[in-house]
């Protein structure tokens, strides 16, 4: 069965169970699963019960697909994502985004936990992702083009400027401190060495993690608008900015 046929089969299964399919989806990254408790009137599915879906193997990723209301908005939420380092192919990592396209999702919010490479950041900061660097060894669009989008997608605005501006406006109104920056995605599963943190900083990255980029690429290929945010959970920049001990 082709990837297209699998995505359609999975979407048809979900449509048979859910009356109101939302237009907005959220991917909850590492440690952010508890946010799902804010969703009301929910209907949830374990990933293992969804045809063709991979299964989360990482602690902190519950592996549930949730439909319900967040505020007054219908929402679809992935409580846990799939990572390249788990042994999945990029086609499998990004399969849920293909399903979103089949469901008619128009906007995707992605979140992750990330290490800060920017010395101006603090642990706990929220960084709005304004761009990314793809450092993965495999590309999710490698191979025959699937007719969800063009062979060569435009990535000049991978993260919606309209959504970024709206988020900045809301953050200002609510007095929420936010950073903006570039996220670099790596394959993992090892955390970065001090030299790697320094290299990523030189390349222009403000935060580094092991997810998000593949999903965003496929979302853009599918014509889905994206907003991304990183929670800065550690500061790798301290490893390469600290004074080095010297003899004499």
Regions found by a protein language model. Name each.
Residues 13, 17, 162, 166-176:
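Generic non-transmembrane alpha-helical segments
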Residues 30-32, 115, 132-133, 182-188, ...:
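Glycine-rich beta-alpha junction loops
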Residues 1-155:
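Metabolite-binding pocket within alpha/beta catalytic cores that recognizes anionic/polar moieties
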Residues 240-248:
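Single conserved hydrophobic/aromatic residue that forms the stacking wall/gate
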Residues 174-206:
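Active-site/ligand-binding-proximal alpha/beta "capping" segment
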Residues 194-201, 205-235:
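A C-terminal functional module that forms or caps the active site or interfaces directly
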Residues 148-160, 185-187, 197:
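Polyanion-binding loop/helix "lid" in catalytic or ligand-binding cores
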Residues 74, 106, 177, 206, ...:
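Residue-level detector of anion-binding/catalytic polar loops
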